[in-house]
């Protein structure tokens, strides 16, 4: 809707907010992973690609690299203990997200990161 309105300033704000959200998400999930496992688990980047996501992907990947992430194969990720119950169907089901593990262990959840601008407030 920003593009349809020709709102270039809001588009730039949206792009910066996109990267801000990704950066804060890195801190949130790394903190949670370290609280639960004492380490970074191999994270999976799942994206539903729209026009903005496609445009931002190079900057997003640069952000991940600058924060020390490496890109590995799904096979390497699945070999980690965290994903064991998702890949070995002989095992009982277990939470497949860090929040689920924290809840199962009765560990308080950290606060969700807050953005400086709510994307829904743009281009109305």
Tell me what each language-model feature is:
Residues 1-39, 53-56:
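Alpha-helical scaffold elements lining the catalytic groove of polysaccharide deacetylases
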Residues 39, 49-124:
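C-terminal domain-boundary segment and adjacent tail
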Residues 42-46:
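Structural preference for beta-strand elements that scaffold enzyme active sites
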